[in-house]
Amino acid sequence: MGQCLGLVQIDQSTVAIKENFGKFSEVLEPGCHFLPWCIGQQIAGYLSLRVKQLDVRCETKTKDNVFVTVVASVQYRALADKASDAFYKLSNTREQIQSYVFDVIRATVPKLNLDDAFEQKNDIAKAVEDELEKAMSAYGYEIVQTLIIDIEPDVHVKRAMNEINAAARLRVAANEKAEAEKILQIKKAEGEAESKYLAGVGIARQRQAIVDGLRDSVLAFSENVPGTTAKDIMDMVLVTQYFDTMKEIGASSKSTSVFIPHGPGAVKDVAAQIRDGLLQANAERND
């Protein structure tokens, strides 16, 4: 923009307001214009057509009595075909826009709870934009876009909200941990049950093998040693198992103190108890 010898240069995205003896004459477009000052023609001012941005911070209170600071960002520009209105009708465009933003936000946010205000930021921005568009179009301005870029609660409220969120996340984590431990316990119990079942099967097979071996031993001994009875053979087997048991107990490093009769005569008592039990069982079966 410049003026020399009545020639005026107007830059791109800018218009100039031409007056003749102080009265509005016309809007000059970008380019070079001739204004003979001697006949009262002059430039009253310039108006940029670029998009401008205004950030407005508005403090208000929500429906649940929480004080918040709402930060709105308004993008606006002057209209070339209404440049005279934009130049003459408003003395301070930014203050005018700020006043309308304050009015709409303070009329909208108090109707919402804090959580709803966060969720409905776009609705608040739309309400502000509609009101600004309706009001500022009469002054030659266009509202390009309005955004609610932040809602800042009071510091103490923000800290409380963070603590609530942290507690909720800890509760979820605790539930997940408990569920995982529950699954581990179930799997462990299933494994122990399967292990005990297999151990029982193994013990049953072992005892069956022992019984089969004893039977074969008794039959073979009675055939090879004439004059022996089944009682003699069982007594000898019991003595052998008795000493094998004492040997295993003594050889084990994890065995505790076990007090059992150590004399060979104790085997006779054990054999007698076994025989008495078998005879009693047979008697009851015959009755």
Swiss-Prot record:
CDD domains, per the entry: SPFH_like_u4
Record keywords, A-Z: Lipoprotein, Myristate
Electron transport is among the record's keywords: no
Coiled coil: none
Residue positions bearing lipid (N-myristoyl glycine): 2
Taxonomy, superkingdom: Eukaryota
PANTHER family according to UniProt: HYPERSENSITIVE-INDUCED RESPONSE PROTEIN-LIKE PROTEIN 2 (PTHR43327:SF58), STOMATIN-LIKE PROTEIN 2, MITOCHONDRIAL (PTHR43327)
Function: Positive regulator of hypersensitive response (HR)-like cell death. May be involved in potassium ion channel regulation.
Protein name, per record: Hypersensitive-induced response protein-like protein 2
Species of provenance: Oryza sativa subsp. japonica
